[in-house]
Amino acid sequence: MMNQSITPPTHPPMSQRFRGYLPVVVDVETGGFNWNHHALLEIACIPIEMDDTGRLYPGEVTSTHVIPAPGTDIDPKSLEVTGIILDHPFRFAKEEKLALEHIFTPVRTTMKKYKCQRAILVGHNAHFDLNFLNAAVTRTAYKRNPFHQFSVFDTVTLAGMAYGQTVLARAVQAAGLDWNAADAHSAVYDAEKTAHLFCTITNIWPLMVAG
């Protein structure tokens, strides 16, 4: 018999919060700006989770360095920005298809946990990350891509609306979060900051509407 003293949650479950989509923050570091020609070099993803009160929080980060796919190019200037050393002995890069499987496996696990139908990419300038992700999926003929092919949540738009800031560093600081410029342009660091920014805005928004 159901305990009548238990108050059911008033917030929608994750499966309904974003119309069946699981938000997953993705950040990529690349060999340039052209996803059809430049190499994918590093990728990090963070599924967004929900606690018992309905508040969103960043889940566990999964990341990997990626071996440049055959036929892709690398602009040396991009390596100056990211600080990636391709032949570093501790880079431990994976071939592109194995890198995708490494990233996508925890995404599918979290989708199943929350009964979501698809993942939706969250990023800062999100279509940049999505285009490189889709290009890698196409190159490798990967068949189990959990992400929506074109829909995204872009924290550039969200931060511009919430704080009047569109640069990630300034948006993060405007949200009251810490930012270390020395750690920027790492896929893991940028993904973590983007995840906290997304959660901060989406958690505050219902309170602003109600108020």
Swiss-Prot record:
The keyword Zinc does not apply. Mg(2+) 1 binds at D27. It holds the Pfam family RNase_T. GO terms for biological process: DNA replication proofreading; tRNA processing. Residues 24-198 form the Exonuclease domain. GO terms for molecular function: 3'-5' exonuclease activity; magnesium ion binding; nucleic acid binding; RNA exonuclease activity, producing 5'-phosphomonoesters. Its EC number is 3.1.13.-. SMART domains: EXOIII. Belongs to the RNase T family. Homodimer. This is Ribonuclease T. The lineage of its organism: Bacteria, Pseudomonadati, Pseudomonadota, Gammaproteobacteria, Lysobacterales.
